[in-house]
Swiss-Prot record:
UniProt similarity note: Belongs to the RNA polymerase beta' chain family. RpoC1 subfamily.
Organism per entry: Chloranthus spicatus
Residues engaged in binding Mg(2+): 493, 495, 497
Keywords: Chloroplast, DNA-directed RNA polymerase, Magnesium, Metal-binding, Nucleotidyltransferase, Plastid, Transcription, Transferase, Zinc
Domain of life: Eukaryota
Reactions catalysed according to its record: RNA(n) + a ribonucleoside 5'-triphosphate = RNA(n+1) + diphosphate
Function: DNA-dependent RNA polymerase catalyzes the transcription of DNA into RNA using the four ribonucleoside triphosphates as substrates.
Stretch forming the signal peptide: none
EC number: 2.7.7.6
GO molecular function: DNA binding; DNA-directed RNA polymerase activity; magnesium ion binding; zinc ion binding
UniProt keyword annotation of DNA-binding present: no
Group of enzyme by EC: transferase
Protein name: DNA-directed RNA polymerase subunit beta'
Needed co-factor(s): Mg(2+); Zn(2+)
Length: 688
């Protein structure tokens, strides 16, 4: 059985043929090695038992029932006194049946087969490493142009019968008609296997030939040479050089990744095809006793059928035309491609009911795949899920948690709090108080949540910002409230998206959440370093409306705040708040508090222009700006009115005070930014 504490991580990558055989092979007491699947059969139609050496063989994958072999004998599992561990008649091991969930097998392919993920996916890894056009490689692998030997090479390092010292071009006219006639003669396969390698075998030889460090060195040298040339003056040539440099960068990165992960390039060409454990591709019986099988079983059967058809002429002494052999190799290649990724080469393969087969790629990829739905999407303890809505009044590091979710997630902590405060004597009474929703329950819940962060996650978690920590607060309703600035990190929208909430239990997890995962500590993109918490959509519209003001300008609505001397004017009112308000003219205020107070009392509007007394800051004054109007008073003071500010000067032309022309929206926005900066400075000084 798999030890869950031993295997703490999962890594996906290429493996060597030796590793595949190590996963699958088992040695029986009689010395026989089992693990290779050679027959395309599943269950016997009469006995309903797995066929020997088939896709569900009990010798290869383990018993269907724990401790019971194919003969029906029983042994106690784990008893060291029980001997032998294998059945001497059928060769089935006496182990737990759960071994069929992870015990693998393999198919020994009669010819090398390229892995379609590395050949057809863009960018093509094989084409990048070999520096060959993808169409040329496809023509070689799938024999689209028969016989395509433009990439064939001698197997032996020394000259052979054909005096081939390297690859030769099929396009040469002298070869064009003689090669097809020669390679369709009897005994071609024996001669071909001795002289040259073709198809996927040729690609495998090419991938195994160069050293990865040599590839990196040559690519780096060529990239530097192209960079030193500079512009040629020809736009088409410059684009060609740019594409070549981009290709060299991709090739260099690929070679470095292969070196770092200890992956050999020739592993991209398969000689052994792993067979999934039977429990991951089951055959079940539905109503009426009709069997229903996974599509992968049918695709495996197709591979085995075609592989056995190719193995027969290669292992026997019968002479087979080379064209027939290469055609059968193409069928094996296409069968393996369909198993790994159905439809990657065009039209997908369908069954008799015109239904597309689900290949291995279809099983693992997408929202309903093995990883996102079965492994990452499974329910866990101390977690909840709900729709997210905007919480504009929240701080960046806070989230609003519905009471219904919060009381379930923190129920154990609330129970402990009720017992510690002697409100409940045992767990049962504490649970009853929680069900009755007594006021003391919410008070204890508030205390528990105050120092306990929660983790919010939105699938798919494609980067580290897909899961962040927040300080929860209780909110009404059934939706999770979220600050709009953290939306981009989750790649979420407030149009019905759902997010999961998790409670970190251990002290280590809580410390990691507080120190590394809080949203206000992840303001920059981890990939490119750009700010990721930036206002978008509704926030930009709100800021625009808040700061748009009255765009008519002072010339359109001319006002002098000091020119109101008629106390009997019915349009003018003066109160004790140190501001003068005129219904027809722009009011002026001594402080921002007075302006906001007037707005709350609905005496002015959000975008109404006003004059606000400002500190004597020379940065407000433009040195070259000419006043629109200058007004003098009998006392000798005068007022210089500009487009966006007003200066009151004394007789000696000294600045007495400055008024700026603004709106309540601008004042509110400025105060919010100022408070945020001051709070950040205090937090920074406290941390240092």
């Amino acid at each position: 059985m798999i030890d869950r504490y031993k295997h703490q991580q999962l890594r996906i990558g290429s493996v060597s043929p030796q590793q595949i055989t190590a996963w699958a092979n088992k040695i029986l007491p009689n010395g026989e090695i089992v693990g290779e699947v050679t027959k395309p059969y599943t269950f016997h139609y009469k006995t309903n038992k797995p066929e020997k050496d088939g896709l569900f063989c009990e010798r290869i994958f383990g018993p269907i029932k724990s401790g019971i072999c194919a003969c029906g004998n029983y042994r106690v599992i784990g008893d060291e006194k029980e001997d032998p561990k294998f059945c001497e008649q059928c060769g089935v091991e006496f182990v737990d049946s759960r071994i069929r969930r992870y015990q693998m097998g393999y198919i020994k392919l009669a010819c090398p087969v390229t892995h379609v993920w590395y050949l057809k996916r863009l960018p093509s890894y094989i084409a990048n490493l070999l520096d060959k056009p993808l169409k040329e490689l496809e023509g070689l692998v799938y024999c689209d142009v028969y016989p395509n030997f433009s990439f064939a090479r001698p197997i032996a390092k020394k000259p052979t019968f054909l005096r081939l010292r390297g690859s030769f071009e099929y396009e040469i006219q002298s070869w064009k008609y003689s090669i097809p006639l020669f390679f369709t003669t009897q005994g071609f396969d024996t001669f071909r296997n001795r002289e040259i390698s073709t198809g996927a075998g040729a690609i495998r030889e090419q991938l195994a030939d160069p050293d990865l460090r040599t590839i990196t060195d040559h690519s780096l040298v060529e990239w530097k040479e192209l960079g030193e040339k500079g512009s040629t003056g020809n736009e088409w040539e410059d684009r060609k050089i740019g594409r070549r440099k981009d290709f060299l960068v991709r090739r260099l990165e690929l070679a470095k990744n292969l070196i770092r992960t200890n992956v050999e390039p020739e592993w991209m060409v398969l000689r052994l095809l792993p067979v999934l454990p039977p429990e991951l591709r089951p055959i079940i019986q539905i109503d009426g006793g009709k069997p229903m099988s996974s599509d992968i079983n049918e695709l495996y059967r197709r591979v085995i059928y075609r592989n056995n058809t190719l193995t027969d002429p290669l292992t026997t002494s019968r002479s087979t035309p080379g064209e027939s052999v290469m055609c059968q190799e193409k069928l094996v290649q296409e069968a393996v491609d369909t198993l790994l990724d159905n439809g990657i080469r065009g039209q997908p393969m369908k069954d008799g009911h015109n239904k597309v087969y689900k290949s291995f790629s279809d099983v693992i990829e997408g929202k309903e795949g093995r990883f996102r739905e079965t492994l990452l999407g499974k329910r866990v303890d101390y977690s909840g899920r709900s729709v997210i809505v905007v919480g504009p009044s929240l701080s960046l590091h806070r989230c609003g948690l519905p009471r219904e979710i919060a009381i379930e997630l923190f129920q154990t902590f609330v129970i402990r709090g009720l017992i510690r405060q002697h409100v409940a004597s045992n767990i049962g009474i504490a649970k009853s108080k929680i069900r009755e929703k007594e006021p003391i329950v919410w008070e204890i819940l508030q205390e528990v949540m105050q120092g306990h962060p929660v983790l919010l996650n939105r699938a798919p978690t494609l980067h580290r910002l897909g899961i962040q920590a927040f300080q929860p607060i209780l909110v009404e309703g059934r939706a999770i409230c979220l600050h709009p600035l953290v939306r981009k990190g989750f790649n979420a929208d407030f149009d019905g998206d759902q997010m999961a909430v998790h409670v970190p239990l251990s002290l280590e997890a809580q410390a990691e959440a507080c120190l590394l995962m809080f949203s206000h500590m992840n303001l920059l993109s981890p990939t490119i370093g750009d700010p990721i918490s930036v206002p978008t959509q509704d926030m930009l519209i709100g800021l625009y409306v808040l700061t748009i003001g009255n765009r008519r300008g002072i010339c359109a609505n001319r006002y002098n705040p000091c020119n109101c001397r008629n106390d009997n004017d019915q349009n003018e009112t003066v109160d004790d708040n140190n501001y003068k308000y005129t219904k027809e003219k722009e009011p002026y205020f001594c402080s921002s508090y007075d302006a906001l107070g007037a707005y709350r009392q609905k005496r002015i509007h959000l975008d109404s222009p006003l004059w606000l007394r400002w500190r004597l800051d020379q940065r407000v004054i433009a040195s070259r700006e000419v006043p629109i109007e200058v007004q003098y008073e009998s006392s000798g003071t005068h007022h210089e009115i500009y487009g966006h500010y007003l200066i009151v000067r004394s007789v000696k032309k000294e600045i007495l005070c400055i008024y700026i022309r603004t709106t309540v929206g601008h004042i509110s926005f400025y105060r919010e930014i100022e408070e945020a900066i001051q709070g950040f400075c205090r937090a920074y000084s406290y941390g240092t």
